[in-house]
């Protein structure tokens, strides 16, 4: 049986000098699946699974980073995730990896319990959420991204048809840079309230009637959808910049309709 010599010192290859003198902007681990709990707007804790990307900047004279420390960081941070804890986690990563710059990103399914508009039956609806943070030269920026499924109904189709109008499921994606803590539910509400109609996981027949008529009374082009959501984001002081996308999965075409608005309020000030 092999026994390690107690006097033997295991070499740290990653910390040796690299003679090529080429810095690496981002190096780390990608697509790490790890259990995660997140705090909801109501103060409850929701269990989910996060897919993590963690990386740091590597100086030109350092051969490699310490990959195991990224995973160790996840193991050490099991408390329910909030924006402030995420910020602290980013700072801790830079200390652990002895790095001047770094980025953390986690994507996870987030569930909201919704009540049907007429019958009142409750059901869960899932949303894709990404929380990201980057730190460079002492400056930390935090981003919250939410993909919200909604319904859109075509104003042109309604106008030219004797009855009915084509409608479809759409995705509104809001990627917001945060100035202050902003609940996931707040971004979801903005997207759903500005769509032709929101979605529910479970609907009874009276609910289906409501959804159909609500969308018909509130038609919107993809251009209308992004502009209306953009107005809401412009008015929210918790958001300093955003990239906003809308994609309509057209029911009468084999392609999507798409629109994007990008704005940094700091440049407009």
Swiss-Prot record:
Belongs to the GTP cyclohydrolase IV family. Its EC number is 3.5.4.16. GO terms for biological process: tetrahydrofolate biosynthetic process. HAMAP family: GTP_cyclohydrol_B. It catalyses: GTP + H2O = 7,8-dihydroneopterin 3'-triphosphate + formate + H(+). Keywords: Hydrolase. One of its GO terms (molecular function) is GTP cyclohydrolase I activity. The gene is folE2-1. This is GTP cyclohydrolase FolE2 1. It comes from Burkholderia cenocepacia (strain HI2424). Gene3D superfamilies: Urate Oxidase (3.10.270.10). It is an enzyme of class 3 (hydrolase). NCBIfam families: PRK13674.1-1. It comes from the Bacteria. InterPro entries: GTP_cyclohydrolase_FolE2, GTP_cyclohydrolase_FolE2/MptA. Pathway: Cofactor biosynthesis; 7,8-dihydroneopterin triphosphate biosynthesis; 7,8-dihydroneopterin triphosphate from GTP: step 1/1. The record marks 154 as: May be catalytically important. Disulfide bonds: none annotated. Converts GTP to 7,8-dihydroneopterin triphosphate.
